Regions:
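Helix-to-loop junction immediately C-terminal to a conserved catalytic motif
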Residues: 59
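Conserved ABC ATPase signature
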Residues: 134-138, 142
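ABC ATPase nucleotide-binding domains
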Residues: 226, 231-272
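H-loop/switch region of ABC-family ATPase nucleotide-binding domains
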Residues: 194-195
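Catalytic Walker B motif of ABC-type/P-loop ATPase nucleotide-binding domains
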Residues: 159-163
Length: 272
């Protein structure tokens, strides 16, 4: 099962028949994907599917063995890798960490314009109250937002996020999804990877299901089907509806008995 999006605008990113290997072991094969202005695309798939590798190929940090990644001229790309808790030995404040995006030096003397830009970005991500805190004192979720703020300081046209909701609580996850929707409305394109099907993927407008190659790509409602999920994850899954929301479970027998009576498989619903 494959599906590619059709755009009326010139894409910012055009991935054509991409292949990436580690030695003789293929990581990605025959990947074709386009990203248009204002796109918000989630990449889902099992561990080892190549999600991070695809982001790195788009960011230009690895060289593919086959195919190509074409970027529009003068495209500004922000890339935030998956963040583990930072334990830096040197004392760096949140303000200084974000400022690195403009100065490329840890303790450079900022201009008034740069100070204003940092303050604006920190406020947008609700980090202004933490500006003078050492980054190593923050939680993992707070640190993740700091690195997103640093990427936004460069005013990217395309933002690449690797597992941005990993290790964050429900409230921070909702805040991040709201921020991504705002960035999209501002015209920024966002591509992110996630393992969280129910908490993140179901809330995104577009999904690409990846397992070494793209199994399917398109509107979330058309991609999140039991057939495509099984091809992607190699396991039987059900897509259920509850209270107007889509829920994905491994299999019906794993569903709580009381909950099972209150949900309807979307496949059956669509056949009525």
């Amino acid at each position: 099962v494959t599906g590619l999006q059709t755009f009326t605008q010139q894409p910012l990113v055009d991935v054509v028949d991409l292949g990436v290997s580690s030695g003789s072991q293929p990581i990605l094969e025959h990947i074709s994907l386009q990203v248009a202005p204002g796109d918000l695309i989630g990449i889902v798939g099992p561990s080892g599917a190549g999600k991070t590798t695809l982001l790195r190929a788009i960011a230009g940090t690895i060289r593919p063995q086959a195919g190509s990644v074409r970027l529009s001229p003068d495209l500004r790309v922000g890339y935030v890798p998956q963040v583990e808790t930072v334990n830096w030995n040197f004392p760096t404040t949140v303000n200084e960490c974000v400022l690195m995006a403009r100065t490329s030096r840890r303790f450079a003397w900022p201009t008034k314009v740069e100070k204003a830009l940092v303050a604006s970005v920190l406020a947008r991500l609700e980090l202004d109250g933490l500006a003078d805190r050492h980054i190593r004192e923050l939680s993992g979720g707070q640190q993740q937002r700091v690195f997103i703020a640093r990427a936004l300081l460069r005013s990217p046209d395309l933002l690449l996020l690797d597992e941005p909701t990993s290790g964050v609580d429900v409230a921070l996850r909702h805040e991040l999804l709201h921020l991504l929707a705002e960035l999209r409305s501002d015209g920024m394109s966002v591509v992110l990877t996630t393992h969280d099907l129910n908490g993140v993927a179901t809330h995104l407008p577009t999904l690409a299901c990846l397992n070494r190659t793209i199994i399917a790509c398109g509107e979330t409602s058309s991609v999140l089907t039991p057939e495509i999920l099984e091809l992607t994850y190699g396991a039987s899954m059900e897509v259920l509806e509850h209270g107007g929301m889509r829920l994905i479970v491994d299999s019906p027998e794993h569903t709580h008995p009381g909950f099972a009576h209150s949900v309807r498989p979307l496949v059956e619903e669509n056949q009525r």
